[in-house]
A protein has these predicted regions:
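Positively charged, small/polar-rich N-terminal and surface patches that mediate targeting and assembly
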Residues: 1-97
Length: 97
């Protein structure tokens, strides 16, 4: 099992949730307002007067065979609007109940 943390511009919310739905990734936790900036490109997302946009985040746990498909779907969303920003990070999950 893998944990995937997805940070994205709020404009991507519907597309990200749709990608999860299409792969039957039902369970996730959603963080509506998440501040940050990309490590390489893109504008900061601080929700301030100067940097008005905001990020959101989703963390989900998926079976190993879903990871590559989900990452591909997320990459496609990002590439269609690169300046908005979207990144996904995968962690090994040792145990859960």
């Amino acid at each position: 099992m893998k944990g995937i943390f997805i940070a994205f511009d709020q404009a991507h919310k519907d597309a990200v949730i749709s990608a999860l739905d299409k792969l039957n990734c039902r369970g996730f936790s959603f963080i509506e307002q998440l501040q940050g900036r990309g490590s390489k490109t893109g504008d900061p997302h601080y929700g301030t007067h100067a940097w008005a946009s905001m990020n959101s985040g989703i963390i989900t746990m998926v079976e190993d065979n879903i990871v590559d498909k989900l990452l591909e779907a997320l990459k496609n969303i990002d590439e269609n609007a690169e300046m908005l920003g979207l990144r996904a990070f995968v962690w090994n999950i040792e145990q859960c109940y």
